[in-house]
Amino acid sequence: MRITGGKAARRILKVPKGLAVRPTPDLVKQAVFNSLGGRVVGARVLELFAGTGALSLECLSRGAASAVCVEKSSRHAETLRQNFQIAGFSPEILQVRVQDVFVALAQLAVAGERFGLVLADPPYGDKNIGRRSTSFAQQLLDEVSLPQLLEPGGLLVLGHTKRDTLSVPEFWRDQKLLKHGDSVMRFLAAARDTQDAASEEIEAPFKRHEEQG
């Protein structure tokens, strides 16, 4: 696994051995960041279910201002910190929160934190034909505090398996879907942003479509 673009491109990142971790594939990361383009530059980033930190490190390499990473596993969080050192970034631009994602979301919302990008590629759920998904991806979509954490015009980029049929609550608006193999990366904006001028900046480059990998 490596950083695919920016000033730390081609740096090889560590992946914990013997642990249930599923890093976002390099081809998927490239597709995501090609779509995001200059939106990453200067952004304050929040990565949920951060694991090795691959997505937030990719953001920092491509010009993001700072990143907050939430990861429940202390062993994964230690690998994340090691990858941060490998990438050569200044320590003050990264905050690692070793805690449950949903506890962290509540605390960040109460603190009034805001982010230009929220990234999450959580562990996949089971196939859910004929019933509502119970996956982590669905739980994130259902979490009412999450859209509150987005700056005006901000985006949530959410990974899930194509077997996971998600229900998108009314406070989100789908902007784009990227597909590669079994992976889907879904771009969403808070519904409040699609009702004002900020939506124009999102919808023009992020018209909903599907790209097959």
Each model region followed by its residue ranges:
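Class I S-adenosyl-L-methionine-dependent methyltransferase catalytic core
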Residues: 1-213
